[in-house]
């Protein structure tokens, strides 16, 4: 016979977010809520109804915003963690395409999303929305599919008279991580361009700016590093050709040869930047760009004022 005691307990459904707070030794023993505390039980059920209404309102708002791309959300999205994880992975691509099509720079990321830079993923370029087959904006899968060089495609379209843009400007530079054979992330440089007719971004992977200059994409200016080896000083004019009486026949560096350290001259950023600035470039920001091998025309490169690279 079942017990008819007034102090007997019954099971009260808990909020999914509160289920993980139950201790393990209570999983098969007495629940927490008792029938004597009907007021607390009623408040708990009221809170659950409010939460369900809140979730339904959020789902309705998302359904109205995204149209039919997102199915109706569950009343409790975290009720089953496995289903929620599968739900999020299944609809991630649809949501990404939708956000990309909202506007020109909605969620495309420029030039690489910061989260993707931290994560080091290499599929960020292929996650863009799929454009029409006759659109050669070169952003998304058209720029990397089949490893076709973007410059060749652009020149071919312009040669055939199918290019509806009149200017190609450099938008800036970015970096993308590739996993090498040793499992180490190798960062390669990007030159991101804008097509004047489309307004879409053109991605061009280049290991250095010299190759882009050789293809005619950069101004013809010498941006190659100059020699940083110490140069002999010009002879100083003297009034007498006789040697100094206290000058030794053999200097100290011949008695105790000091091996020259190339890292002290070549890999010293201060000396390298100073010589590059003095002989090759005009201002300090051009020197820094030439030093790191990233050429960005100042009149076409835009970035936030407090995050300038110079």
Curated annotation (Swiss-Prot):
What protein name applies here?
Answer: Protein RL1
| Record function comment | Degrades the host antiviral factor SLFN11 via the cullin4-RING E3 ubiquitin ligase (CRL4) complex.
Where would you find the membrane-spanning parts of this chain?
A: none
Instruction: Tell me where on the tree of life, at the top rank, the source sits.
Output: Viruses
Query: Which residue stretches does the UniProt record annotate as biased composition, category Low complexity?
Result: 238-248
Q: State whether it acts alone or in a complex, and with which partners, per the record.
A: Interacts with host adaptor protein DDB1; this interaction allows RL1 to recruit the cullin4-RING E3 ubiquitin ligase (CRL4) complex and promote SLN11 degradation.
Species this chain originates from? Human cytomegalovirus (strain Merlin) (HHV-5)
Q: Where is the composition biased (Basic and acidic residues)?
A: 35-44
Positions of region (Disordered): 1-44, 205-252
The UniProt regions of compositional bias labelled Polar residues, in chain numbering, are: 1-12
What are the start and end residues of every segment in region (Involved in the interaction with host DDB1)?
A: 153-159
InterPro entries, per database record: HHV5_RL1 (IPR016394)
Q: Which family does it belong to?
A: Belongs to the HHV-5 HKLF1 family.
